[in-house]
A protein has these predicted regions:
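Walker A/P-loop nucleotide-binding motif
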Residues: 20-38
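Sensor-1/coupling segment of RecA-like P-loop NTPase cores
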Residues: 25-27, 109, 119-149
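Conserved NTP-binding/hydrolysis module of P-loop NTPases
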Residues: 44-50, 54, 58-76, 89
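Conserved P-loop NTPase "ATPase switch" module shared by AAA+ and STAND
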Residues: 91-113, 117
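Interdomain motor-coupling "hinge/lid" segment immediately C-terminal to the ATP-binding subdomain
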Residues: 142-238, 242
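Accessory nucleic acid-recognition modules appended to NTPase machines
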Residues: 201, 207-375
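Conserved catalytic cores of phosphodiester-cleaving nucleases, focusing on short active-site segments
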Residues: 352, 378-402, 409, 423
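Domain-level recognition of nuclease-like catalytic cores that cleave nucleotide substrates
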Residues: 424-454
């Protein structure tokens, strides 16, 4: 099922229509849907697709020649890149597209591929092509690639990052889930469609976890650790840090006390994890109350990596010997609502962004964020050009949002030194009567239930 990528598809088509040879780097995390997007883009076009693997440059050329041979194109056994490019451009018809998937494997050892590509695109007699260089190595593309290529990077036409899909796309993909199970499943799989294939909305969320995560023969069983190991060495160190973060050790000092690693070492490894978008540093919305915020907070950003290190990583032995239903009751059920709560905040923020795009909010908001205080949090702050603010909280864990929670929110406003012109309180549970009465008296206060979010 191809969903939620209409904007990306249009972007590629617009690039294709440009005159001259274009070289576009398309990148994003593994499973984000890059290959599926490209398959839809080239389905009515003249395209050669090749997936590079980790090997020598000479072997890479041999594999490319073999691929062309399978298409009925005669090639020498050990061709040069120049010969490969020449054969590709000789095809008749519309503008040729060359897609090199996981192209970082072509150039991490040397620049021979890019040097040959540079020579090709500067030939006077060349035909126009659209060359797409695709990669799952986010950290390498954003932090190392240009330095590795040097002056050769100037031939690149642009970079296009494929981001996670939204909750609404996830919900459309799994229409049979209840809204509670839908948000819970999204907190595990996130907006990574490559992971969606492993869940089935004909079953409950619990049944999906027990059947497709807690079984040692299933792909998701050790996917979290495999995902980390693909990009990083010294996995013992990274596993320890991720396990500590998943356990709730979010500050540098907490990680230092828990792991025994030096602060300098922890900082370096956290930086590497952030470059790969596995971990993120939490920043509060900038207000006059910055002295009342918590600083230096780190958390796991990748949803499935978070779930894996929270529930599977510390309980490997128990998973192997306990029945799955017993394991779920003992180790997942007691804290799962708290785990989902962070995702629910993002779903609420996405709802507000959608309402804003449809002009259903009182103002057009241009800045947004959250405020993490020492005595309480403001889950979202939206600010317009006139610096008017819409803010609120998102309750997932409590069965009922109480008037006292509203009062705490108002105290957090004072600590943040802001005054929200509009307040929205989201709750997966009910609202108490006092809150409902307050809403009747205050036209700038709104209460939003799960059902109202659609």
């Amino acid at each position: 099922m191809f969903t939620g990528r209409e904007k990306e598809l249009q972007y590629l088509n617009d690039y294709y229509e440009k005159s001259g040879t274009q070289i576009l780097v398309v990148y994003g995390q593994k499973g984000i849907g890059k290959t599926t997007l490209l398959e839809h883009f080239v389905e009515d076009k003249d395209c050669l697709y090749y997936e590079a693997i980790s090997c020598s440059t000479r072997q890479q050329r041999v594999f490319m020649a073999s691929h062309l041979g399978d298409m009925g194109i005669s090639m020498p056994e050990y061709p040069e890149f120049e010969e490969l490019f020449s054969v590709i451009e000789e095809s008749k018809g519309s503008k040729k597209i060359l897609v090199i998937d996981e192209f970082q494997n072509m150039c991490k050892t040397d620049n021979e591929f890019f040097e040959a590509l540079y020579d090709y695109i500067n030939r006077e007699d060349k035909k126009d092509m659209f060359i797409i260089l695709c990669s799952s190595s986010i950290g390498w593309v954003e932090n190392s690639m240009v330095g590795k290529l040097g002056a050769l990077s100037r031939m690149l036409s642009g970079f296009y990052k494929i981001k996670e899909l939204k909750y609404q796309d996830f919900k459309a993909h799994f229409p049979l889930f209840s809204i509670e199970d839908s948000i819970g499943a999204f907190s595990i799989l996130g907006g990574v469609p490559g992971l969606w294939q492993y869940f089935n909305d004909e079953f409950s969320l619990r049944e999906n976890i027990e059947s497709f995560i807690l079984q040692s023969n299933e792909k998701l069983f050790d996917y979290g650790q495999q995902y980390v190991a693909e990009e990083l060495r010294e996995t013992a160190v990274y596993n320890t840090l991720l396990g500590a973060l998943a356990e709730g050790k979010h500050k540098l000092n907490d990680l230092y006390r828990h792991t025994g690693f030096s602060r300098a070492k922890i900082s370096v490894y956290l930086k590497n994890l952030m470059q790969l978008e596995i971990v993120e540093k939490v920043f509060s919305f900038d207000t006059e109350g910055r002295d009342n915020t918590q600083k230096g907070i780190y958390q796991i950003k990748h949803p499935y990596v978070h779930f894996y290190y929270r529930y599977l990583f510390p309980n490997q032995t128990k998973i192997m010997f306990w029945e799955t239903d017993e394991f779920y009751d003992q180790f997942i059920a007691p804290t799962f609502k708290h785990f989902v709560a962070g995702c629910y905040k993002k779903v609420c923020q996405e709802f507000l962004e959608r309402e804003s795009a449809l002009e259903r909010l009182p103002e057009k908001f241009i800045n947004r964020g959250e405020w993490v205080g020492k005595k309480g949090n403001i889950d979202f702050i939206f600010q317009d050009e006139e610096e008017e603010i819409l803010a609120g909280i998102c309750n997932w864990e409590k069965e009922m949002l109480m008037y006292e929670d509203y009062q705490l929110f108002m105290e957090c406003q004072e600590s943040a030194k802001i005054k929200a012109e509009y307040i929205i309180l989201f709750s997966a549970g009910n609202f108490d009567n006092r809150l409902r009465e307050e809403m009747k008296k205050n036209p700038k206060l709104a209460l939003v239930s799960l059902e109202q979010m659609g």
